[in-house]
């Protein structure tokens, strides 16, 4: 099935053409990072207006790069939620319009569900598998037993890992988004140079908390300002990044032990982080498990990842109704209700 996938949950307008839920014919992403950098974070109203401006050009570009027309599309997959309501509505409206005009089915997909299956665009993963999804808004551990069959094992109790990266970067005076900048500076620093907390590291549970680490960064910068560029700033970035990675790895290792699964997916925007990729590779090597981390282009928000579960649901006859609305909050444990 040739699926047009559309993603507009936050600040990327994306469209992709994927054949059979596996072969990417095109994947176009229009980022708003430069626009929101002026405000130090995503402004929902501005994001929605930019999506309205870019949705048609992005879809047209995806079709052109794939060498197909609207008449070739057999189904549409679109992010229904979670995300910014106004932003989601732009993508959903476009998907409904195309599906209605062409007389083809469409399906609303959970944004995180897309991240879970991003590795399938490179090589399928056998069920069951453990998934760690780390991004600006999510830090969750899931047991994935099949399409639509997800069990949340752990989640952030406050800030997500990506949010902690961006807020800590802002505290240091680094430009938005700061996660990539911290990663780059960390490679020039010493991860053991500055002592920082590892929240909930030894609590015995699988939940995460990064607000305390963020506060520790604020206190450190307040008492000991650093010059950028500079060796001390690099050390602080390296120490912060190592603290985050230590927590993520420890919780993931505990989840692997509890579930007994031998396959691990690490996905989401923070999965681009070089320190996290190295740490997870070391964990996988030590435990002899099958680790899948998508290529960086598939870690950040994109539309192609939505086509994997979208294609499955459409082929199973689980299309969405035109009356379906966006949902800004959506529990992953309930995604499979009414379909599988």
UniProtKB/Swiss-Prot annotation:
Keywords: Acyltransferase, Cytoplasm, Iron, Metal-binding, Transferase, tRNA processing. It holds the Pfam family TsaD. It catalyses: L-threonylcarbamoyladenylate + adenosine(37) in tRNA = N(6)-L-threonylcarbamoyladenosine(37) in tRNA + AMP + H(+). Its EC number is 2.3.1.234. One of its GO terms (molecular function) is iron ion binding. Its cofactor is Fe(2+). It comes from the Bacteria. Fe cation binds at residues 111, 115, 301. It is found in: Cytoplasm. One of its GO terms (biological process) is tRNA threonylcarbamoyladenosine modification. Substrate binds at residues 133-137, 166, 179, 183, 273. Binds 1 Fe(2+) ion per subunit. GO terms for cellular component: cytoplasm. Required for the formation of a threonylcarbamoyl group on adenosine at position 37 (t(6)A37) in tRNAs that read codons beginning with adenine. Is involved in the transfer of the threonylcarbamoyl moiety of threonylcarbamoyl-AMP (TC-AMP) to the N6 group of A37, together with TsaE and TsaB. TsaD likely plays a direct catalytic role in this reaction. Belongs to the KAE1 / TsaD family. This is tRNA N6-adenosine threonylcarbamoyltransferase. It comes from Pelobacter propionicus (strain DSM 2379 / NBRC 103807 / OttBd1).
């Amino acid at each position: 099935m040739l699926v047009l996938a559309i993603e507009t949950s936050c600040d990327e307008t994306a469209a992709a053409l994927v054949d059979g839920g596996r072969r990417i014919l095109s994947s176009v992403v229009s980022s708003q990072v430069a626009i929101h950098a002026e405000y130090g974070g995503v402004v929902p109203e501005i994001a929605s207006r930019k999506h309205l401006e870019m949705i048609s050009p992005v879809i047209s570009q995806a079709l052109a790069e794939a060498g197909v027309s609207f008449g070739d599309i057999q189904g549409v997959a679109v992010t229904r939620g979670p995300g910014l309501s106004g932003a989601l509505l732009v993508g959903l409206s476009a998907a409904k319009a195309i599906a209605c005009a062409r007389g083809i089915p469409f399906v609303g997909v959970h944004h995180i569900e897309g991240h879970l299956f991003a590795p399938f665009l490179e090589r399928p993963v056998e069920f069951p598998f453990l998934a760690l999804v780390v991004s600006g808004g999510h830090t969750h551990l899931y047991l994935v037993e099949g399409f639509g069959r997800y069990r949340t094992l752990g989640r952030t109790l406050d800030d997500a890992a990506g949010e902690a990266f961006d807020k800590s970067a802002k505290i240091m005076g680094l430009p938005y988004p700061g996660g990539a900048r911290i990663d780059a500076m960390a490679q020039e620093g010493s991860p053991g140079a500055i002592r920082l907390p590892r929240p909930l590291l030894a609590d015995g549970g699988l939940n995460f908390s990064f607000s305390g680490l963020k506060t520790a960064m604020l206190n450190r910068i307040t008492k000991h300002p650093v010059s950028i560029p500079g060796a001390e700033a690099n050390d602080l970035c390296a120490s912060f990044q190592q603290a985050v990675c230590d927590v993520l790895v420890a919780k993931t290792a505990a989840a692997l032990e509890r579930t007994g699964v031998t396959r691990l997916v690490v996905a989401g925007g923070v999965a681009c982080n070089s320190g996290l990729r190295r740490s997870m590779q070391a964990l996988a090597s030590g435990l002899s498990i099958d680790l899948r981390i998508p290529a960086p282009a598939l870690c950040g928000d994109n539309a192609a990842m939505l086509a994997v579960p979208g294609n499955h649901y459409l082929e199973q006859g689980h299309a969405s109704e035109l009356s379906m609305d966006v949902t800004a909050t959506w529990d992953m444990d309930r995604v499979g209700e009414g379909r599988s």
